[in-house]
Amino acid sequence: MRIALIGTGMMGERMGGRLLDAGHELAVYNRTRARTTALEARGAAVAGTPRAAAEGAGFLITMLSDAGAVRATAQGDTGFLAAPGERLWVDMSTVSPAESRELAAEAHRHGVRALDAPVSGSLGAAVRRRRRRRRGGGAL
């Protein structure tokens, strides 16, 4: 399965590595291109826009710092919501419940199913695979 990962900072890079370890085809996008080099060296395709990362992916993950960063990568002609095709979007970003509901409603208008699944824990917890996750969303 092709997976798109938007946000390859400290946590996103670790998650991307785990996805590659599991044998998934991975496309990544990060606003700072230099943050994608470690995953690219391991076989991930680096996209020039969030939309390009999402194209052809049945599953998309965002791991971003706040709702503004999620909106910046989701919206507009180059945003991942503009990519054609159906997909499941799992937002693991640091976003309030109200913002998460707003983003999910926008995704729904674009035919994208959305789940909110923020993670908590430190980088050390991520390395040890000990992050805590919560999930929320409508019926899939």
What are the residue ranges of the model-derived segments?
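NAD(P)+-binding Rossmann beta1-loop-alpha1 motif at the extreme N-terminus of oxidoreductases
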Residues: 1-59, 83, 87, 92, ...
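Short, well-ordered alpha-helices that flank and scaffold nucleotide-derived cofactor binding pockets
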Residues: 17, 21, 75, 105
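Active-site-adjacent beta-strand anchor residues
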Residues: 29, 63, 93, 134-136
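A general structural signal for well-ordered alpha-helical segments in protein cores
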Residues: 36, 57, 67-70, 100-103, ...
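Alpha-helical structural signal in soluble globular domains
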Residues: 39-42, 76-79, 83, 102, ...
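A structural signal for hydrophobic residues in beta-strands of small regulatory alpha/beta folds
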Residues: 47-48, 61, 115, 134
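Beta-loop-alpha module in the N-terminal Rossmann-like domain of NAD(P)-dependent dehydrogenases
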Residues: 60-80, 93-100
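Rossmann-fold dinucleotide-binding core
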Residues: 73, 95-140
